[in-house]
Curated annotation (Swiss-Prot):
Gene Ontology molecular function: C4-dicarboxylate transmembrane transporter activity
Protein name: Putative uncharacterized transporter HI_0586
Bilayer-crossing regions: 1-21, 28-48, 54-74, 96-116
Subcellular location, record wording: Cell membrane
Key words of the record: Cell membrane, Membrane, Transmembrane, Transmembrane helix
Main location: membrane
Membrane topology field: Multi-pass membrane protein
A GO CC term assigned to this protein in UniProt: plasma membrane
Family membership noted in the UniProt record: Belongs to the DcuC/DcuD transporter (TC 2.A.61) family.
Top-rank taxon: Bacteria
Residues forming coiled coils: none
Length: 145
């Protein structure tokens, strides 16, 4: 049975990658493949139980709300624009190293904010505009988060 579950998992990962490359809706692909995998492994409620358990954590909601609030205040006060102008010139000479540096910064922020949505809100409000202004393509900058 464990071998069957492993095979289902590998096929599910391959199917997910295939549909994402074909530009299918990300959320639909992930929930669909997850539900199909849980049904095939004879645990149809397993995926939903894990999702519900992770969403009911009070710390998760607080982290997401505070990060979204931070991003909104940065945008509303236009601090993000000023930060971009301040950092663009010094960072434009580091084009080759900007992606690894941004990845490392995001990793360290993700330690403090364990939620992916909260981390993306906190880092995306500042790093993506900085990367775009420094010459990194928008699609590449958006893939970091």
């Amino acid at each position: 049975m464990e071998l069957f579950k492993s095979i289902v998992a590998v096929i599910g990962i391959i199917a997910t990658i295939y549909f994402l490359i074909k530009k299918a809706e990300t959320r639909t692909v992930l929930i669909g493949v997850g539900l199909i995998m849980s049904i095939l492994t004879l645990n149809p409620m397993g995926a939903l139980d894990a999702f519900a358990k992770s969403m009911t954590s009070g710390g998760l909601i607080m982290a997401i709300c505070s990060s979204m609030g931070f991003a909104y205040v940065m945008k509303y006060t236009q601090c993000d624009t000023h930060l971009v102008h301040l950092l663009t010139k010094p960072l434009s000479g580091l084009k080759f190293f900007l992606i690894p540096i941004a990845t490392i910064i995001t990793f360290f922020i993700n330690i403090a904010i364990p939620s992916a949505a909260g981390c993306a809100a906190a880092v995306g409000a500042t790093l993506i505009p900085v990367l775009k202004s420094a010459g990194v393509r928008p699609a590449t900058a958006g893939q970091l988060f």
